[in-house]
Amino acid sequence: MNQQRYAAYRSLVTELNEWKFARALQPETHEELCDAAEGLLLARGGDEAEEPLARASTTVLGMLALDELDEQNASWLLDAMLSCGPRMPQALEHAA
């Protein structure tokens, strides 16, 4: 973890809390995304970050499928998640 990743994590959690309080995010989904963000924050390398990133991606894709999230916010959310974790060049290649 470093200061930049911690700041990204705090910013993401603040935004997720706002979405939850605005009822734009279900409590279970909020918990899943916050847990994944914390897992990414605490990951020391790409291998440790794969599982929380996969959970976050699955959650975001599910929200897109149910029209609970638009593509712009989904893209922002995944970018914000990636910012919480260690550099993962292979994740960026697959996301493009």
Go through each PLM region and give its residues.
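Intrinsically disordered, low-complexity linker/tail regions enriched in Pro/Ser/Thr
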Residues: M1-F21, A96
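Amphipathic alpha-helical interaction modules
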Residues: L16-G62
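Amphipathic alpha-helical binding modules
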Residues: Y9, S57-A96
